[in-house]
Structures are given as C-alpha cells and as structure tokens.
C-alpha cells in the first residue's frame, strides 16, 4: 500500500491520503499514457506494470523550489506551502478565472527523487486558502511553471545522455525540441545553458552556417518566395560558379536546391548569401547531399575509389597522374583497405573526366578499376542505406507556407526531403550548444527515429495528423509508450487537473523528451485549412477524431468570458503586450510564448483551442507595438480576424476567421496575411452572432478589403526592397560582353504616355531593326494612353549592347518630353515564356493594337510581324462578353481595368516588372 511505502521512507502519511489519490485520465503535456493507470486508482499493481524505462535514474528532476509543490521539506502536515518568486510568463492557458477556486486545491508535489523505485507514488497535500482571492490567483499564476533557466539548464543537460542510452546514437549533443519543431531563444539562454553544462563554443547565432557542418556541392536554400522567377535564382547563384542543377520544383513550398559543379563555389555561395535579403526575406542556406539513387549519373559524385593499383605506386605519383583532369582536393588510402585509393576532386566534372580517362588504364602492369563514390563524411552508413525505408533517418518535408520553412532535426544527423521526384539529404551540425538546432526559424513535419515500416505509407507531402484513417500511426505496433497529447486549457481547467492529482513532474517531462520517438509521436500536426480543416481537439488530437469546431483564438469555448472591466493584473504573468492593458478587449495577446512551448505546426500561426497563438519568443521581445496600438496605421483590422473579444458577446460565438494564415511573422513585426484578410459582412456576422447586432459593438473604422490589401502590399514592398534585390534587374553591359548574363528581355521605362506602339517601333527601328522578336506596350483603357513602360525581347544577349547605348539615359524626341529612358531586365525572360504568359490573357480579347507583337527573325520575312498565338483557355474580362471587347475599344467605352489583365494604369506590371 502507498502508506507502507511512505512509512519506509520515514514520511508521515496524511490522513486524507487514501481518499484523495487522483490520477486524471485527461492527457496533459508531460504525463504518462492514460491507459497505464485508470482514473481514481493507484497502488503497487498498476505502477509496477509500467515500463522500467519510465523510471530510470536518468530522469532528470527540476529543482524543488521551482516546482509547483504543495509539500514542505519537513513533511509536516501543517506546514504552509512555500511560494516561488520566479517570474514566469505563459501563453499556454487563457486567462479565464470564472470557476478557478470553486473548491479547495489539492496540489501534487513535483520534486520526486530520480532514484525512486517503480512502486513509489507521490503524495498529495491539501493547499490552504490564502487570505483573499486576488492573492491566491496571483500567487498561483506566478508559480505554475519552473524558472526558465533552470528548466533548460537541467533538462538539456540530461537529455543528451538519456538519448544515447535509449537509441544508441553517438551524438555529441541532443536537440531538446528538434523532433517537435523549431523554437527561438535569446542569446542569454544559450550562454546559461552552455555554462551550466560545461560546454564551450558552437553557439551559432540564428541564421549563420553551423560550424562543423560538412560542406557539399548542393545547397538547400530556404525562405524562398514563391514569386521569385527561376532565372533570378539562376543569376543569383551563377555568380559564384557553374551550376550543375537548380531544383525549383519545391519553390512554392519555400525552398530550392542548388547543385554546384565545384564544392568551393558552393562554399562561397553559402557564405556570401547566408542571411541576405531576397524579396524581403533572409535566405537560410544549409549544405545537403543527394541521396544515393540508381537513376543518378555515377559521374556526379565528385570522388573516386581506385582499385587494383600496384602497391609500388605512391600517392604522389598517382596525384601527378590524376591532377591533369582537375584539381584534387584529397588523395589517400582508405582505412578499411590499404590497397584502395580514395580520390576527391573539387569539381565533379574533373571526377567524371578522370573516371573516363583512367578506368581500365594499365599502370605498372595492372589495369586500374575506378568506382565513383560520394565524398567521405557525406555518405550514409550501410545500415541506414539498407533500412532507410524503415525510418533509420529522420525525414523532413515542407508544408504549404508562403514564406517557406525548413525543418531541423538532430545535430549531426542527415534528413531527407523530396525534390523533383528524388530526395535530398540535409547535413546538420554535430557540434555546438545543446540547443542550437531547435532555435532555428523553421518548422518541420518529421518522422522520428525508430518508426516501424508501417509509417512508410504516410505521404511526405502530407502533414502528419491529417492522414487517412487507414494510415495513422499505431502506438501499439511501435512498442513504445506514446507521449500524451497537448491540450491547451484555460487556467481554471489546469488547476482542476492539479486538484485531481494530474502528475506534471519533472521526471515525467525529462523522460518524455529523452526519446525522440516518444516526443514526436505524441504530437499530431494539423495543417489548418480554414475552419473545416481543424480538428476540435487542437494540437495533439487523436488522428481518428473527426469532430470539427470553429477555431477560437485567445478563448476557450468551455469557459466564461472574463470581465473586461476588471482591473486585476497578474504580477508574475503579464497579460498584455507593449503596455496594452486588458481593458481593451478586442485584442488580447500574451507578451511571449512559454519556454517549454513546442512549435509543431508548419503554418505561420498555430491556432490552439483556448490559448494564445504560439509565436517565437524573440519576436515578442522586439517590442514592436503592432497589435492594438494603432489599428488603422498598423493594418491590424479586427474585422479580418477571428476570436477577438467583442463587447456584448460571449466567447462561445467568437468572430470566425477566414483562413489559417491570419498572422505571419515577417521581419520584426506581426503582419496580417494580405491574401486572407477577409472582412466579414454584416450578413455573415449575423450568422455567427444570432440575435445580436454584430456591427453595433464593433469599431466603426473599417476600410475595404482592396484598400487594406493595397496598404499592406505597399508597406510590404517598402520593407522588402533591398540593394541585393534590385541588382537582379540591373543591366550590366560588361557582364553581357563577358557572356555571364544571358537574359534577353528588357523593360523600357519612362516612355511618354502619348507614344503608340507604331511610334515606339519606329524609334527602335532607327537603331536596332531586326534585332528583336517581341514588343509589348501596355495601354490604359481609360484614357487610351500607354502606362509609361514597355517590354522588348532581343534575339541574342549581345544585341542588348547597341540597344542599351541607343536608348538608356536618352530623352525621347517627340512631344518635347523631359522623360529619360532607362533600361532594366524584366522578370519574365525569353520569347517562349512571354508567349505562354500572354496567350491565355484577356488581352487576346482586346483590339490587336493592345496586344503584344511578335516578329519574324529568320528568312525573307525577318522583321515583319507574325500573328500572336491564341491560347485554348483565354480568360474573359468579368462582366463583359468576349465578342464586345473590340467594339467597346473602338467606341471608347472601355470599362476599368479588370483584375485579370496584366497591365495596370499606375505604371507597374505585377508579372513582368521587378518587385
């Protein structure tokens, strides 16, 4: 019996101990699996059946003074509970306190000894109420969680050793949160963690290349905007060396692969472009290697193994033999076979040439046998190569996010990601601080080490947790104890769980995160697709659960609304951001995420039932008052967002949100995703708030969605402009003459608005007749004038030089215009791409004078116009039949420019002009 155990330890058993042992069945973060022990039952039989791995001495404990404990060290039943003075911030729970203290709190002690045997249980003590409700609430909020430094210092110090014991991996460090998503920490946390664990160096700032990362010819480039053209990326990366391959199939998912021929070019590109701005986002570059694939060319590996070489041939002699094919990076005898020579070239083309020239060559009476191989240090072990389908290596995929995000896994491990039907391997740092991997800016969908073959049926492009019912992970088949799911709750529900004896001990937490498979299996990632795509249970909901409910931000549907007029403030847990008080109910957010919060979802914001959005803590520390400080100037409009408190309405009817991409973290502020900023109409809101006047209690300053989109787009374009981005479109004659820039499509700016296509052609033909095959002068149909710019495609890059000298920086002759022509590159390059862009455009319904013009470049008709090919799926202008477009143009009754047309009257072309 538990009382016998307590007597053996010399601790008196409280009189109420036998009646008040409660172990809740509701799963909490850090709790043991619920089916291990039924509710309201405890004792030797059930505890002894638990796996011994859950009770090892390695389970690291948090400090007693930082725990939420109701026991006194003396063990006296009359001893008062001590109060921890640590300052704590948490956004796990909403601030509803309606039924917080409806009964006495029975709090469980959390300072369980690490050497406690499997049949030992912890005692519950009854908390005596304080003098006032305010004092109880304030003290409880402040003491909910342990101190941040203590948590990370102690947990991370033990997790590495526990992981090696459980998995057999000989990792120098273990990433505490790597298997369950990225997390950012401030620099002082790095220092404290490294200092406490006695480790030096390796603390890389966010975004820098990891020291110890193995260089390779292939770079995985993250934070790539989907609207960046392929030729822009090619120009950007080609300046460092010849590119072997550019994989952009996953560009819409936020990353690309760039393979260089020379490994030195890849290193130079990684160093030069790391953290450089491209379309307003910082590039994140990692080295990666190609997975061994039979379909790949064997000559692209960059290294050779030389067999059947006479032992009298020294390495120096062999070096002289092979260096004629290219520079040799390394040449040596292999460790496992002294007769085998390993040769690595800087350039894969040199390796291919050496393979073709030396294989079968007779040297000292023996024919050389050369076998292509991957550079050592980047190949997979034979065990992983054989068992790769069984989850030997963690796998990474990218979800559909606008900015694109890259997952991080265990330091020193290699993860794979899909690209062009094949897969790539990402090499991560094997040295450095114990938490340097989970502080990256990326989120990932990962399958941890140790998953059985049944997990292979899960599509890599599909978020874990949204799989079909027939392909979900079965914990019983894995032979592991699953990590209980995370259910964010209001504070009242959280305390109720404590009252029922829910164990949130440091040992359970450290035991849980010590095994990567446990830590990741308990989280089910939901890629939220509006209201219908969200599982009612929030993050961690069972995959078989099919219930749906609307997404509520900052509120819990099971709790009552906090009185907005209350002046209650929490001394240890701030409930406002940037001095925005809680009396402003329409916007209520928390100032930072809790230290132990795990970012699992891949979307820019994670919607949790009953909790504030989980955002990286350094973002909140930037103290940018973008929330509720100035609703109109900041672009943060209540009408576009869900779960905002509305006076006179209950939280059970929150304002619905239009999409899961409500917020996005961009730079150092919180932006509203412009593509999903939807203003609910009064009719729509009336369905959400039956019996109420939904707009009566709302702020009156609502602008239209189009105006809001323009404001947000203008602010985003200003913040994203950079010199590096502009250089992509600058025309450099010297690079053209050297053959380094092969683009042919130009944008002619500052054209007088009275110029027609015929006048422009006449001016061009005076200097460069027959050198171009495409011309397009966009027309504003309102005033029948051009919009100030045109696009021309030269037949060869060399033809740009005389065209540039004839027009760039020159004034136009007609109309006494003061405009000075300037030339830049266009976004869309090449005649083929231009035709594909316009052939299905609504321009094909307009008068021929408004369409792009093509020209013959060969034969006797060179220089003459040719018909523009019509597409099979031509778009029509909204509200206007196709047949009436030409008549309307001729009668000067053209309506305003439609949203589908590529030209705009303000002088900017969203498809062809640079951003």
Curated annotation (Swiss-Prot):
Molecular-function GO terms, alphabetical: mRNA binding
GO biological process, one term: meiotic cell cycle
Recorded phenotype for the gene knockout or disruption: Early flowering.
Biased composition (Basic and acidic residues): 16-25, 705-723
Limits of the RRM domain: 217-290, 302-375
Region annotation (Disordered) ranges: 1-90, 690-723, 854-915
Tissue specificity remark: Expressed in roots, shoots, leaves, flowers and siliques.
Keywords for the protein's UniProt record, in alphabetical order: Activator, Meiosis, Phosphoprotein, Repeat, RNA-binding, Transcription, Transcription regulation
Matching SMART domains: RRM
Start-end of Polar residues biased regions: 50-65, 78-89, 882-898
UniProt feature, compositional bias: Low complexity: 66-77
Residue positions where Phosphoserine is found in the record: 76
Top-rank lineage group of the source organism: Eukaryota
UniProt keyword Ribosomal protein present: no
Pfam family, one: RRM_1
Database matches in PANTHER family: RNA RECOGNITION MOTIF-CONTAINING
Function summary: Probable RNA-binding transcriptional activator that plays a role in meiosis and vegetative growth. May be a downstream effector of TOR signaling pathway and recruited by RAPTOR1 for TOR substrate.
Protein name in the entry: Protein MEI2-like 1
Organism: Arabidopsis thaliana
């Amino acid at each position: 019996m538990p009382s016998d155990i307590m007597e053996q330890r010399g601790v008196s058993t409280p009189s109420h101990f036998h009646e008040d042992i409660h172990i809740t069945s509701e799963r909490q973060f850090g709790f043991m699996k619920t089916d291990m022990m039924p509710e309201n039952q405890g004792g030797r039989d059930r505890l002894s059946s638990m796996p011994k791995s859950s009770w090892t001495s390695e389970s690291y404990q948090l400090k007693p003074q930082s725990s939420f404990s109701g026991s006194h060290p003396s063990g006296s039943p009359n001893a008062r509970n001590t109060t921890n003075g640590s300052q704590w911030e948490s956004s796990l729970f909403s601030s509803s306190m309606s039924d917080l203290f409806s009964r006495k709190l029975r709090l469980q002690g959390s300072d369980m000894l690490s050497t406690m045997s499997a049949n030992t249980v912890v005692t519950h003590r009854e908390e005596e109420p304080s003098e006032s409700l305010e004092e109880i609430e304030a003290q409880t909020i402040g003491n909910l969680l342990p101190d941040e430094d203590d948590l990370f210092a102690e947990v991370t110090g033990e997790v590495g050793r526990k992981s090696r014991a459980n998995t057999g991996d000989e990792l120098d460090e273990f990433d505490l949160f790597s298997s369950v998503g990225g997390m950012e920490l401030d620099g002082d946390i790095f220092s404290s963690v490294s200092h406490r664990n006695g480790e030096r160096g390796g603390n890389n700032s966010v975004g820098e290349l990891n020291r110890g990362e193995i260089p390779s010819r292939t770079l995985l480039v993250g934070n790539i905007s989907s609207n960046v053209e392929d030729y822009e990326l090619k120009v950007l990366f080609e300046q460092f060396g010849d590119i072997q391959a550019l994989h952009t199939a996953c560009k819409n998912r936020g990353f690309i692969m760039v393979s260089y021929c020379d490994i030195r070019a890849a290193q130079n590109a990684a160093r030069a472009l790391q953290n450089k701005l491209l379309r307003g986002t910082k590039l994140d570059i990692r080295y990666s290697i190609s997975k061994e694939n039979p379909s790949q060319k064997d000559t692209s590996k960059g290294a050779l193994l030389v067999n059947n070489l006479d032992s009298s041939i020294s390495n120096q002699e062999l070096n002289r033999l092979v260096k004629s094919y290219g520079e040799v990076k390394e040449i040596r005898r292999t460790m496992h076979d002294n007769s085998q020579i390993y040769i690595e070239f800087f350039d894969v083309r040199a390796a291919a040439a050496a393979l073709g020239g030396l294989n079968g060559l007779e040297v000292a009476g023996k024919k050389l046998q050369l076998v292509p191989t991957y550079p050592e240090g980047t190949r997979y072990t034979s065990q992983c190569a054989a068992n790769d389908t069984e989850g030997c290596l963690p796998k990474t995929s990218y979800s559909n996010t606008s900015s694109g995000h890259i997952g991080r896994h265990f330091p020193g491990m290699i993860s794979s990601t899909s690209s062009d039907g094949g897969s790539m391997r990402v090499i991560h740092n094997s040295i450095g601080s114990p938490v340097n991997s989970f502080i990256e800016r990326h989120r990932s969908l990962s399958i941890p080490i140790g998953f059985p073959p049944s997990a292979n049926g899960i599509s890599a492009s599909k978020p874990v947790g949204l799989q079909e019912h027939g392909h979900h992970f079965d914990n019983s088949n894995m032979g592991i104890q699953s990590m209980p799911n995370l259910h964010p709750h209001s504070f009242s529900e959280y305390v109720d769980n404590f009252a029922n004896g829910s164990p949130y001990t440091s040992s359970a937490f450290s035991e849980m995160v010590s095994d990567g498979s446990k830590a990741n299996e308990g989280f089910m990632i939901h890629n939220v697709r509006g209201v219908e795509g969200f599982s009612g249970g929030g993050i961690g909901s069972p995959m078989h659960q099919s219930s749906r409910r609307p997404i509520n931000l900052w509120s819990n549907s099971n709790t009552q609304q906090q009185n907005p007029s209350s002046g209650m403030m929490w001394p240890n847990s701030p409930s406002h951001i940037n001095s925005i008080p809680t009396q402003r109910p329409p916007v209520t957010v928390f100032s930072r995420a809790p230290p132990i919060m795990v970012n699992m979802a891949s979307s820019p914001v994670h919607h949790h039932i009953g909790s504030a959005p989980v955002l990286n803590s350094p973002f909140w520390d930037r103290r940018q008052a973008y929330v509720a400080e100035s609703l109109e100037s900041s672009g943060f409009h209540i009408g576009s967002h869900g779960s905002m408190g509305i006076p006179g309405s209950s939280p059970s009817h929150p304002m619905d949100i239009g999409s899961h991409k409500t917020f996005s973290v961009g730079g150092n502020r919180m932006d509203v995703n412009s593509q999903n900023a939807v203003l609910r109409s009064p009719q729509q809101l009336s369905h959400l708030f039956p019996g109420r006047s939904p707009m009566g209690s709302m702020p009156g300053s609502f602008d239209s969605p189009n105006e809001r989109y323009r404001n947000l787009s203008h602010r985003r374009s200003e913040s994203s402009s950079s010199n590096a981005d502009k250089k992509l479109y600058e025309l450099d004659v010297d690079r053209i003459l050297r053959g380094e820039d092969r683009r042919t499509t130009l944008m002619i700016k500052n054209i007088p608005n009275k110029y027609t296509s015929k006048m422009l052609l006449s001016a061009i033909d005076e200097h460069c007749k027959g050198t171009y095959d495409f011309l397009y002068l966009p027309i504003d149909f309102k005033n029948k004038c051009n919009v100030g710019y045109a696009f021309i495609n030269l037949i060869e890059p060399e033809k740009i030089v005389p065209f540039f000298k004839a027009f760039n920086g020159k004034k136009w002759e007609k109309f006494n215009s003061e405009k000075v022509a300037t030339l830049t590159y266009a976004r869309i390059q090449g005649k083929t791409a231009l035709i594909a862009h316009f052939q299905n455009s609504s321009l094909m319904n307009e008068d021929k004078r408004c369409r792009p013009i093509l020209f013959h470049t060969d034969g006797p008709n060179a220089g003459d116009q040719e018909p523009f090919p019509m597409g099979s799926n031509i778009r029509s202008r909204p509200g206007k039949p196709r047949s009436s477009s030409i008549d309307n143009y001729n009668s000067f009754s053209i309506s305003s420019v439609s949203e589908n047309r590529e030209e705009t009257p303000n002088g900017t072309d969203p498809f062809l002009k640079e951003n």
